[in-house]
Amino acid sequence: MIEHGSVVEHRRVIELRRVARVFEVGTEQVHALRDVDLRIGQGEYLSLMGPSGSGKSTLLHVLGLLDRPTGGQYLLHGKDVTALDEAEQARTRRLHIGFVFQAYHLVPRLTTAQNVALPLVLAEVPPAERRERTMAQLRAFGLLDRTNHLPDQLSGGQRQRVAIARATVTRPELLLADEPTGNLDRANGLEVVRILEQLHDDGITLIVVTHDQELGRRAHRQLRMDDGRLVGDVGEGLGPNPGPNSGGLRGQSEDGT
């Protein structure tokens, strides 16, 4: 089992016990995850790296309750969430987990404000509180002057800021980011990283999937996957963030995907 000292010192948020994920492709079985054991403490900042097809995104989807493991257990705050039905898993996602994706996944017909407010609508937050929290997010992410813009009227960096604002409007404790700088140039990529790291400094548990070694090394704890297995776990847990200009963060992942 891959362990880490910080989990002893900080309240455990996540525990995976021999988690496996097998996909049926025709007559073939593809083992995307193989007996993954992992513990993550509250407030950690992790990167998840490895070659294409190593299982990084599958693991992130399992952690985010977007996919169910074929075997093993996923404990979130000690509760086996693999045993929950679809409605219970959806409620757990809304309460505890935020997502940021490479492709933004904004709703094209909704304005910036409407995209940010969408999780609050789904959570049935009252309209007055919904507006207040949405405007607070727009202000915090420098998007007030883009409140009524549609996604195709925004730059890539602005779209990703909208996506992060939407992901955190419900105040989740866990933020999962899958190649968050992959579609951005260097300047916008660094700005997105700065925002994510500020959210971590504010107390959120942050897990970033990336091909970019320079981005991965910014994390305090660095996990490496290969062929569906965790094969490396290095770092010092909750140490200080590197400076905003450390490293030459590329705006695109190292293999261009």
Where are these regions (language model features)?
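ABC-family P-loop ATPase nucleotide-binding domain
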Residues: 1-22, 232-257
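H-loop (His-switch) and adjacent beta-strand-loop-beta switch element
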Residues: 222-235
